[in-house]
Amino acid sequence: MRNIKVAGYGTYIPENFVKFGNQIRHRVVKEDNITQIDMAVEAINKALENAKLEIENIDCIVSTSAVCAQLIPCTAALIHEKIAKGTNIPAMDINTTCTSFISALDIMSYLIEAGRYKRVLIVASEKASIGLNKNQKESYELFADGACAIIFEKSNDKKKGVIYSLQQTWSEGAHSTEIRGGGTLKPSMIFDQEHVSDYLFDMKGKEVLLLAARKLPKFFKTLFKESGLGISDIDMVIPHQASRALELIMKKLGIPKEKYIDIVQDYGNMVSVSVPFTFCKALEAGKVKEGDTIILTGTAAGLTANAVILKI
């Protein structure tokens, strides 16, 4: 076990929202002049206040945003500029798109356990609405904006921490969810209106769902076998709020309704923010509490699946 615990957390959700039927999506509007970095800073300040800490008490800042604020430098450096300028706290990005937060928790738990860092700030911030294609109704009505920051630190309680983690990628799904433009394959300098869709989010939802449905049962079978646990040992599953198909996937995995959190209707898919935000909402509502064993899990573009079993 990697002995870590939550020291504090904070979230930020834009006040503005749009409705698609009974589905609510919080999105930044141009008039608000709120950047992805601004949202991250709001969440971080709340997390520091919640933990009763100052930024100087943080040993590492990790940004897990799926989409960067700018290509260079890393988003974590831009966040550092706003909250830690004048310090030499290391800052880095960890990116597996929607499951970036889980990947970061997994990686940083090893570094905390090894003594490299005592306390790590992991922040996810997404302005997904800016890159949506209005012609793709499914994804246009699904995604939302927001930010979440959680501070993890070394735990002296040997019963708390990461019990087991697993990540797998099936690259046959690499082009089922993508933004093709903006990198070296299709740089922004060759942008033209004829190919504008290359620079907007493109998701083939049915392909993703079918691939996930084929791969996830075996993924979870491995997770439980290697960890020595079963669903009866888990108090709550905190899944990525991928889509309204969440209930179908959970049912296929044999996870009963009372053992997972579903807030898709109220918040939609906030990309890398979804998992930590759902975790924080569960903590606030008392749906998970100290001593519980939980699973943070989700799928991401790639197709990647991620899971961390955590004793909180």
Set out the residue ranges of the language-model regions.
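Condensing-enzyme catalytic core mediating Claisen C-C bond formation in acyl metabolism
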Residues: 1-34, 136-210, 218, 312
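Buried hydrophobic positions in well-ordered alpha/beta secondary-structure cores of metabolic enzymes
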Residues: 6-8, 47, 61, 104, ...
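A structural motif shared across PLP-dependent enzymes of the aminotransferase-like
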Residues: 14-20, 38, 67-78, 242-245
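Conserved catalytic cysteine-centered active-site region
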Residues: 27-35, 65-120, 251-279
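Phosphate/pyrophosphate-binding loops at sites that engage ATP/ADP/AMP, CoA/4′-phosphopantetheine
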Residues: 43-59, 218-235, 282, 286-287
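Acidic, glycine-rich active-site loops and adjacent beta-strand->loop/helix elements
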Residues: 64-69, 96-99, 124-129, 168-170, ...
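Flexible, glycine-rich active-site loops centered on histidine and acidic residues
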Residues: 113-147
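Catalytic phosphate/nucleotide-handling subdomain of diverse soluble enzymes
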Residues: 277-297, 303, 307-312
